[in-house]
């Protein structure tokens, strides 16, 4: 007992000698901490308050380190806070993973923001993850607008300098010459006025023609919209004009002989296939329930018996009434059945499969984190959009998400995969990359597989990648396939491994939205080269904002982007040659209204949901009617109205015919837009006058890309020197295909979108390259031409004698050799 008493006395003496010195700020911190401790009554408040004293204790420790003996006091406070944290952790463990009704998980960061008005899947991303900031290393994007603005500034400076010189020269001439000569100099200035008058007259004529044309178009549209079902009356009205023979409708009732022959062949082929295919479908698909059709009318999300967090998530994005595809899909998906679903574009197919997935995941075991769902998309933009929609709907749950798409950091995605997120949203290529090369990613636990835009995923371009995924993931899974143009081919669907799937075809006839007006502008034979003039007229005079223009080729989209920039039209481009950061920036700029036109390839034709798209213009008709439906489906979504305008030439006759036929059967509005050929020729001439400047911009862009590539190579070399050991220790990433197989797959994918190429591209030999280079140099410089036949037959007299002597000598040498 004596030693204990002595130690207590010593400790008391030390405490008496120790004097606490606290500043005014630290007193305030302590008082606030006491008030927060008294307010924490529930478990949630205790958890929130537990983090605040920790931070304040750390701050106190940093401020007290300079004082003697303060470390001991800091240690005591840390021990006390540690004991409180352990006690709270034990209290939290008593729930055994159950959800508290008062507890709110805020994964997306918008739990308390209320209803999100006009949510379109491209809202600002608040949650952490790869969607926030794409990691592309040190790649520098080349901005076309910067190049064009620099060139304009340079031209303006040169013009200003030239004008100053001209003004100075005129002033000098005015001092030296007489008044008559001054009058002559004024006459010389009239040339500039004439030039200005020419420009003004040109602009005035254009404005007058455009106004008249727009008025005619409005009248034509109104007449056509009133009589959309009877196209013949439109043609009779247009015949009254003098130029009606050149500008009549594409949807003319006079059938082309090739069209009639093709339709007969197609009908015979369809009748033969239908019988066999019907038997296959009857054996493959599960029988449809007839009772569901009557019960799906006037239902709400509450009728599906969804959990409260899911209903709150739906209300937060202003989803109140389920669409027809959602009414059919959600009850069947909750039962765990395989689904093949189809509906028109903009009908809510994403929510149709996300909602039942979230509902099923709410009842998952929580002790061990496990990835249970994989959603595969054909494009990066669609995957990013689906990720945003899913995180918004799951705001009030504890379900975690991960997106695996190209263009983002592999390391960050691997770190997220280590946490085993519940739902993985990916493109096939990056999914296979992580499946083969990320040790923390396992697919053995997947229970649900979703293929969005499934008909595109089943095409030849994705066939090898899809087979690699399907043979790796478990066979005992729920599989759901969705698309606006879903295929019924049993042979293709068998590859996915479906087990008696349920067909949910809300739109089995591949129709467009009823609020969509389809327009067609016909190019007569021989006017295909004026296509750009028609596009510029439409974008300058008719459709001036919120327009998506679709192209078949990336090269054409990029070139038209430069033309738009030179003509002062604000536009952005979207295609596969851009980096992921550029692609997301283009979509965001268009969504926010910073640019009026989005020039895109078929990369953006599927699934992209941007609010307020008023018009879709097809620069060329697509390869198939299915692609046409996806393109025009970017507008007139979710009950809104929109227009689709297609510039069609003779090669596009088949697609236009099928679109008009489907539209008439549906009762959709089909309009023929008449454009004055003279106006289109003027715009085409303007575009042709910019060809030299376009080539200069392309050359400057090429040089900037080469500079950026060189800088990247230098940075790569520096990193190899600095971090050689770490880089060489990494395992080499593998792929299931060779480079030759990759090229073949890309070729098949291009063929699906653009049709077979007219001639196969073959790598040129060095001899062929040299021959082509020589021909190009001769053509450009008019040098190095060989003598023609006339020059060889009529040479000069002196050269003729010399040639005879040389020939005689050669003959003599030959004769001597024979002797």
From Swiss-Prot:
Q: Which PANTHER family match?
A: ATP-DEPENDENT RNA HELICASE DBPA (PTHR47959:SF1), ATP-DEPENDENT RNA HELICASE RHLE-RELATED (PTHR47959)
Q: Which organism is this entry from?
A: Neosartorya fischeri (strain ATCC 1020 / DSM 3700 / CBS 544.65 / FGSC A1164 / JCM 1740 / NRRL 181 / WB 181)
Residues where ATP binds: 343-350
What is any one GO biological process for this UniProt entry? Answer: ribosomal large subunit assembly
Q: How does it assemble?
A: Associates with pre-ribosomal particles.
The cellular location(s) given in this protein's UniProt record come to: Nucleus, Nucleolus
**Compositional bias annotation for Acidic residues:** 23-38, 80-105, 173-185, 210-243, 260-277
Sequence motif: DEAD box, positions: 452-455
Matches recorded under Gene3D superfamilies: P-loop containing nucleotide triphosphate hydrolases
* GO molecular function terms listed in the Swiss-Prot or TrEMBL record: ATP binding; ATP hydrolysis activity; RNA binding; RNA helicase activity
Q: Its catalytic activity?
A: ATP + H2O = ADP + phosphate + H(+)
Q: Which SMART domains match?
A: DEXDc, HELICc
What residue spans carry the Basic residues bias annotation? 55-67
Q: Which PROSITE patterns match?
A: DEAD_ATP_HELICASE, HELICASE_ATP_BIND_1, HELICASE_CTER, Q_MOTIF
Supply the EC number(s). 3.6.4.13
Location of the motif Q motif: 299-327
Q: What is this protein called?
A: ATP-dependent RNA helicase drs1
User: Where is coiled-coil annotated?
Assistant: none
Residue segments, region Disordered: 1-299, 732-819
């Amino acid at each position: 007992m004596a030693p204990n008493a002595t130690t207590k006395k010593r400790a008391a003496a030390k405490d008496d000698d120790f004097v606490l010195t606290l500043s005014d700020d630290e007193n305030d911190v302590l008082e606030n901490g006491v008030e927060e401790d008294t307010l924490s009554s529930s478990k949630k408040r205790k958890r929130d308050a537990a983090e605040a004293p920790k931070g304040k204790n750390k701050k106190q420790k940093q401020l007290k380190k300079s004082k003697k003996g303060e470390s001991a006091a800091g240690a005591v406070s840390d021990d006390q806070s540690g004991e409180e944290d352990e006690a709270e952790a034990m209290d939290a463990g008593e729930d055994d993973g159950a959800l508290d009704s008062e507890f709110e998980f805020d994964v997306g960061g918008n739990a308390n923001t209320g209803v999100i008005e006009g949510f379109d899947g491209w809202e600002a991303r608040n949650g952490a993850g790869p969607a926030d900031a794409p990691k592309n290393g040190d790649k520098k994007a080349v901005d076309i607008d910067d190049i064009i603005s620099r060139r304009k500034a340079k031209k303006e400076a040169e013009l200003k300098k030239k004008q100053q010189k001209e003004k100075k020269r005129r002033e000098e001439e005015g001092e030296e010459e007489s008044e008559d000569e001054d009058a002559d100099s004024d006459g010389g200035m009239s040339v500039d006025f004439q030039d200005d008058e020419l420009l003004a007259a040109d602009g005035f004529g254009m404005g007058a023609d455009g106004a008249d044309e727009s008025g005619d178009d409005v009248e034509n549209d109104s007449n056509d919209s009133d009589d959309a079902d009877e196209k013949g009356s439109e043609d009779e009205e247009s015949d009254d004009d003098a130029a009606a023979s050149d500008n009549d409708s594409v949807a003319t009732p006079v059938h082309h002989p090739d069209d009639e022959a093709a339709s007969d062949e197609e009908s015979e082929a369809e009748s033969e296939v239908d019988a066999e295919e019907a038997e296959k479908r009857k054996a493959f698909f599960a029988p449809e329930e007839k009772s569901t059709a009557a019960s799906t009318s006037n239902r709400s999300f509450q009728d599906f018996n969804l959990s409260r967090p899911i209903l709150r998530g739906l209300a937060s994005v202003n989803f109140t009434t389920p669409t027809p595809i959602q009414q059919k899909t959600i009850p069947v998906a909750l039962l765990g059945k395989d689904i093949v679903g189809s509906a028109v574009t903009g009908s809510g197919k994403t929510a149709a499969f996300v909602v039942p997935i979230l509902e099923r995941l709410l009842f998952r075991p929580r002790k061990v984190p496990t990835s249970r769902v994989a959603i595969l998309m054909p494009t990066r933009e669609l995957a990013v959009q689906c990720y945003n929609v899913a995180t918004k709907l799951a705001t009030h749950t504890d379900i975690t998400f991960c997106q695996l798409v190209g263009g983002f950091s592999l390391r960050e995605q691997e770190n997220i995969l280590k946490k085993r997120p519940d739902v993985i949203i990916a493109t096939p290529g990056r999914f296979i990359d992580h499946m083969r090369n990320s040790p923390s990613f396992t697919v053995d636990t997947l229970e649900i597989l979703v293929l969005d835009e499934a008909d595109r995923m089943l095409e030849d371009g994705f066939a090898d990648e899809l087979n690699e995924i399907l043979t790796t993931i478990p066979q005992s899974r729920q599989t759901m396939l969705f698309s606006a143009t879903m295929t019924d081919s049993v042979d293709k669907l068998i590859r996915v491994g479906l087990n008696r799937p349920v067909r949910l075809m809300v739109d089995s006839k591949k129709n467009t939205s009823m609020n969509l007006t389809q327009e067609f502008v016909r190019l007569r034979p021989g006017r295909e080269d004026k296509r750009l003039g028609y596009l510029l007229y439409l974008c300058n005079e008719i459709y001036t904002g919120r327009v998506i223009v679709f192209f078949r080729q990336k090269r054409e989209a990029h070139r038209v982007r430069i033309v738009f920039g030179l003509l002062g039209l604000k536009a952005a481009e979207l295609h596969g040659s851009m980096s992921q950061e550029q692609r997301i920036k283009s979509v965001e700029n268009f969504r926010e209204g910073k640019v009026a036109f989005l020039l895109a390839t078929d990369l953006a034709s599927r699934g992209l949901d941007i609010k307020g798209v008023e018009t879709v213009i097809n620069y060329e008709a697509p390869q198939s009617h299915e692609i046409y439906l996806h393109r025009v489906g970017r507008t007139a979504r979710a009950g809104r109205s929109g227009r689709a305008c297609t510039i069609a030439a003779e090669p596009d006759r088949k697609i236009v015919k099928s679109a008009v036929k489907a539209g008439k059967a549906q009762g959709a509005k089909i309009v023929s837009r008449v454009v004055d050929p003279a106006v289109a020729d003027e715009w085409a001439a303007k575009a042709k006058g910019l060809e030299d400047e376009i080539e200069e911009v392309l050359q400057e862009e090429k040089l900037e890309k080469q500079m950026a590539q060189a800088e990247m190579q230098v940075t790569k070399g520096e990193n190899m020197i600095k971090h050689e050991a770490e880089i060489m220790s990494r395992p080499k990433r593998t792929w299931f295909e060779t480079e030759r197989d990759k090229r073949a797959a890309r070729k098949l994918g291009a063929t699906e979108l653009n049709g077979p190429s007219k001639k196969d591209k073959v790598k040129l030999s060095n001899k062929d390259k040299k021959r082509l280079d020589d021909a190009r140099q001769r053509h450009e410089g008019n040098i190095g031409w060989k003598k023609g036949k006339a020059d060889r037959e009529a040479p000069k007299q002196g050269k003729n004698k010399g040639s005879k002597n040389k020939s005689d000598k050669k003959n003599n040498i030959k004769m001597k050799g024979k002797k």
